[in-house]
């Protein structure tokens, strides 16, 4: 099984890449975490629906290798770290590769949301794209540490 973060966007600042790389490195060999950048559609003369449809085509191609799709959405379920750990454990039991989709500036196409197995949000706050990617990497590592009883996460 592997976890994938499919993020619509451009190359992020070095500090974000370094932070993500640190948590990716900490993941065990049997549960690798990969980040794949999906090229955003150029805005020139296109409306929101056209932009999302073009990005959907790219996301669909990347999602073909994943059995479970989780979208990050501001209207998604608000999970605590322990609840995310429970979901991660469930996805691990299912055994298929799991993709986490972070949309671009205009969000995620409704067709991707409709076929997603789950919809979660990282925070009630609006996070910049770079921060969302880094927070997701850290939270997946933290959730795995809870599942594995590793001392990284401390309750209370």
Name these PLM-found stretches.
Residues 1-156:
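Post-transcriptional modification and biogenesis factors for structured RNAs
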């Amino acid at each position: 099984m592997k976890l994938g973060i499919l993020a619509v966007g451009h190359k992020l600042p070095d500090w974000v890449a370094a932070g993500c790389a640190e948590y990716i490195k900490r993941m065990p060999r049997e549960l690798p975490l990969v980040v794949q950048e999906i090229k955003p559609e150029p805005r020139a003369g296109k409306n929101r629906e056209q932009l999302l449809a073009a990005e959907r085509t790219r996301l669909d191609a990347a999602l073909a290798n994943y059995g479970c799709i989780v979208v990050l959405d501001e209207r998604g379920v608000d999970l605590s770290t322990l609840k995310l750990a429970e979901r991660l454990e469930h996805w691990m039991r299912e055994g298929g590769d799991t993709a986490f989709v972070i949309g671009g500036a205009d969000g995620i196409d409704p067709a991707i949301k409709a076929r997603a197995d789950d919809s979660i949000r990282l925070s009630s706050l609006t996070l910049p794209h770079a921060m969302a990617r880094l927070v997701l990497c850290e939270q997946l590592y933290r959730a795995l540490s809870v599942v594995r009883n590793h001392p990284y996460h401390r309750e209370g």
